[in-house]
UniProtKB/Swiss-Prot annotation:
Keywords: Cell outer membrane, Membrane, Repeat, Signal, Transmembrane, Transmembrane beta strand. Pfam families: Omp85 (PF01103), POTRA (PF07244). Belongs to the BamA family. GO terms for biological process: Gram-negative-bacterium-type cell outer membrane assembly; protein insertion into membrane. This is Outer membrane protein assembly factor BamA. It is found in: Cell outer membrane. The lineage of its organism: Bacteria, Pseudomonadati, Pseudomonadota, Gammaproteobacteria, Enterobacterales. Part of the Bam complex, which is composed of the outer membrane protein BamA, and four lipoproteins BamB, BamC, BamD and BamE.
Length: 803
């Protein structure tokens, strides 16, 4: 047997041993230990080839090259005559990766981090990388206050040089802040300063923002808040000298000490602006005006810089630089602010592009643009385009990106990146109440028909008391100037008695056409004509109905028909930040109609809806919503408004917790009426001379509804779905009344239905979800102020309608 000479041993387990420094010519190369790695691949990674003359340095380079491939745990190179014998031990292949005990970090996030480090199924296992991963994960837990956390990588060998990799987590508990001390504060108390922190050593039950669990990132944010607090009050020399975070021996408690130097208060002595102002010095000077003796304020300085950038952005200077340098005079405690402005190049827009609009046509988005291609860039015009796209309601998110054109010093492309949502909805509603039982409704609505922007709806209701169908179409851009054209046709067969309303049947059909005229960015006027035919039958006489029939000259009619032509009008002010689930802004909608000559009836009717969203945090996750709805109508020329045109309240869109349309005046049937006027739902004759009181709603010619809603982040919902789900707590109130009601015409036990003070109230919780079927709305409300005859419906569920 030929004697083998050891040239260099493993870099991991023994030192390099050199024999034959003179070198030799390699006639052959053999490998031992290769399993997964092919011989050819191993040879290609080596700097030595057959026929080369090699020495100790070449052998060292060979070993390093083989280790560098990441495929081997051990490499030895031996000489057998003129043959190189390469002995290797391959790293095992990862067959599977699992996790155990991780609650704070999701599996998907862990897999992404492992893949970024080269640890994935099918790859070789590098044990040194595992150590780094263990340490990195433990450091993450330490940063969020879990100092007792540990992460261990468990490697289980499998046949054919494979392993199972399992990361075992012991997260422990978050260390809670025992005390926060601020040392060096004299102008403000420690309690006052800490009240602005997210981290707290004491958190009252009502504080949903404060947190006793220590997090390094939150502490950094709180320190910045502390700095801003002082700088905004004139303390220009304020400094955070040091911060100590101490851990209790059991690693469950944290003590934080912040050492500060307040310094003195300084006043602004003036602002000096210099640099390239691009000819807008007068406008910039207005933005930098200060009141004499005003305290230095860091936030105002930052806002001033942003305002200057926005001003220049409106004129096409897309990338201006604005830097403020305070010159502090310690002698007289003043600060002179020197503002250097560099407007940079002026840009014009080469192209406007859209990304993410797989359904919506480019033309639908482009017509909402206020920034034009080939024109100077205007940041305000770009933002207006974003607002208008958001208000369409077609998209979950809209983002803008201004991109430089390569090779051009004065051109940019504006890119609108949208994420489309499902604009079609299958409208299905179900409600359940202690008295009402189960009720249903259905319909289909598509607000972006085939991506054209057309709104098309087919709605229908079929139940025990109603057969209703409607087809509606709206073209929002009937003309290139944005004049809209909408129309609808409908048919309705309504058995009011079965709906717990006053006893009559109405078969109606009609149509209307409406034009919308945009006045400016936020205001639209509407005008149109309508026709409706109403055929009433089976009318059991009740006081409100009799008043109407008497005004029409047919007081004893049990059947009645009317054909009416109406002039329809409206006005909409819309400054909401987006079309669905708004978080900021207001919307006002006024609608009305009045009969025109040729109509059997003579009346007018008007309603006003308002909604205002006020965010109370910068991220718009906590929002206060106020809604109102007002309605009023009356007859003209001595006639009354038809009773079937009355306003109603109650239900998911007005006062939740009450059955739909049941709030307000109830029918008082006249002597001889044959109806189910009592609570037993048994038909019988009314025999009381003064009339019979009932629980059948008749509505009124006046209505007022208001709602106060507090929108909160939805618990247990990931950030991915945060824009699709909304949770809120609400307080609803509303009333319906009849301004023409005469209390003397009814029995003494009947309430005064002309009194608007009979307000109903409820409170509850609502959940809205933009599901694949369309908007899903769940609400549970408890009426806490109601009157005799009101019908509760605590749980309500609806698909296809949000507010």
């Amino acid at each position: 047997m030929a004697m083998k000479k050891l040239l260099i041993a493993s870099l991991l387990f023994s030192s390099a041993t050199v024999y034959g420094a003179e070198g030799f010519v390699v006639k052959d190369i053999h490998f031992e230990g290769l399993q997964r790695v092919a011989v050819g691949a191993a040879l290609l990674s080596m700097p030595v080839r057959t026929g080369d003359t090699v020495n100790d340095e070449d052998i060292s380079n060979t070993i390093r090259a083989l280790f560098a491939t990441g495929n081997f745990e051990d490499v030895r190179v031996l000489r057998d005559g003129n043959t190189l014998l390469v002995q290797v031990k391959e790293r095992p292949t990862i067959a599977s990766i699992t996790f155990s005990g991780n609650k704070s970090v999701k599996d998907d996030m862990l897999k992404q981090n492992l893949e970024a480090s080269g640890v994935r199924v099918g790859e070789s296992l590098d044990r040194t990388t595992l150590s780094d991963i263990e340490k990195g994960l433990e450091d993450f837990y330490y940063s969020v206050g879990k100092y007792s956390a540990s992460v261990k990588a468990v490697v289980t060998p499998l046949p054919r040089n494979r392993v199972d990799l399992k990361l075992v987590f012991q997260e422990g508990v978050s260390a809670k802040i025992q005390q926060i001390n601020i040392v060096g504060n004299h102008a403000f108390s420690t309690e006052e300063l800490i009240s602005h922190f997210q981290l707290r050593d004491e958190v009252p039950w009502w504080n949903v923002v404060g947190d006793r669990k220590y997090q390094k990132q939150k502490l950094a944010g709180d320190l910045e808040t502390l700095r801003s607090y002082y700088l905004d009050r004139g303390y220009a020399r304020f400094n955070i000298d040091s911060t100590q975070v101490s851990l209790t021996p059991d690693k469950k408690g944290i003590y934080i000490t912040v050492n500060i130097t307040e310094g003195d208060q300084y006043k602004l002595s003036g602002v000096q602006v210099s640099g390239n102002l691009a000819g807008h010095s007068a406008e910039i000077e207005k933005l930098t005006k200060i009141e004499p003796g005003e305290l230095y304020n860091g936030t105002k300085v930052t806002k001033m810089e942003d305002d200057i950038k926005k001003l220049l952005g409106r004129y096409g200077y897309a990338y201006p630089r604005v830097q403020s340098q305070p010159e502090i005079n310690d002698a007289d405690k003043t600060v002179k602010l020197r503002v250097n402005v560099d407007a940079g190049n002026r840009f014009y827009v080469r192209k406007i592009r859209f990304e993410g609009n797989d359904t919506s046509k480019d033309s639908v988005l482009r017509r909402e643009m206020r920034q034009m291609e080939g024109a100077w860039l205007g940041s305000d015009l770009v933002d207006q385009g974003k607002e208008r796209l958001n208000r369409l309601g077609f998209f979950e998110t809209v983002d803008t990106d201004t991109q430089r054109v390569p090779g051009s010093p004065d051109q940019v492309d504006v890119v609108y990146k949208v994420k489309e949502r499902n604009t079609g909805s299958f409208n299905f509603g179900i409600g359940y109440g202690t008295e009402s039982g189960v009720s249903f409704q259905a319909g289909v609505q598509q607000d972006n028909w085939l991506g054209t922007g057309y709104s098309v709806g087919i709605n229908g209701t079929k139940n025990d008391y109603q057969t209703y169908s409607e087809l509606s179409v709206t073209n929002p851009y009937f003309t290139v100037d944005g004049v809209s054209l909408g129309g609808r046709i409908f048919y309705n067969d309504f058995e009011a008695d079965d709906a717990d309303l006053s006893d009559y049947t109405n078969k109606s059909y009609g149509t209307d056409v409406t034009l919308g005229f945009p006045i400016n960015e936020y205001n639209t006027l509407r005008a149109g004509l309508g026709y409706v035919h109403n055929k009433l039958s089976n009318m059991q006489p009740q006081i409100a109905m009799d008043r109407y029939l008497e005004s029409m000259g047919d007081p004893d009619a049990s059947d009645f028909a009317a054909d009416d032509f109406t002039f329809n009008y409206g006005w909409t002010y819309n400054k909401l930040d987006r079309g669905y689930f708004p978080t900021d802004g207001s919307r006002v909608n006024l609608t009305g109609k009045v009969t025109i000559p040729g109509s059997d009836n003579e009346y007018y009717k008007v309603s006003l809806d308002t909604a205002t969203y006020v965010p109370i945090d910068n991220d718009h996750k906590w929002v206060v919503l106020g809604r109102t709805r007002w309605g009023y109508g009356d007859g003209l020329g001595g006639k009354e408004m038809p009773f079937y045109e009355n306003f109603y309240a109650g239900g998911s869109s007005t006062v939740r917790g009450f059955q739909s349309n049941t709030i307000g005046p109830k029918a008082v049937y006249k002597n001889g009426a044959h109806t189910s006027w009592d609570d037993n739902d048994d038909y019988e004759d009314c025999t009381q001379e003064s009339g019979c009181k009932s629980d059948d709603a008749v509505g009124g010619n006046a209505m007022a509804v208001a709602s106060l809603e507090f929108i909160t982040p939805t618990p247990f919902i990931s950030e991915k779905y945060a824009n699709s789900v909304r949770t809120s707590f609400f307080w609803d109130m509303g009333t319906v009344w009849d301004t023409n009601w005469d209390p003397s015409s009814a029995p003494s036990d009947v309430p005064d239905y002309s009194d608007p003070g009979n307000i109903r109230m409820s409170a509850g919780i609502a959940l809205q979800w933009m599901s694949p079927l369309g908007p899903l709305v769940f609400s549970y409300a408890q009426p806490f102020k109601k009157y005799d005859g009101d019908k509760a419906e605590q749980f309500q569920f609806n698909i296809g309608k949000t507010w």
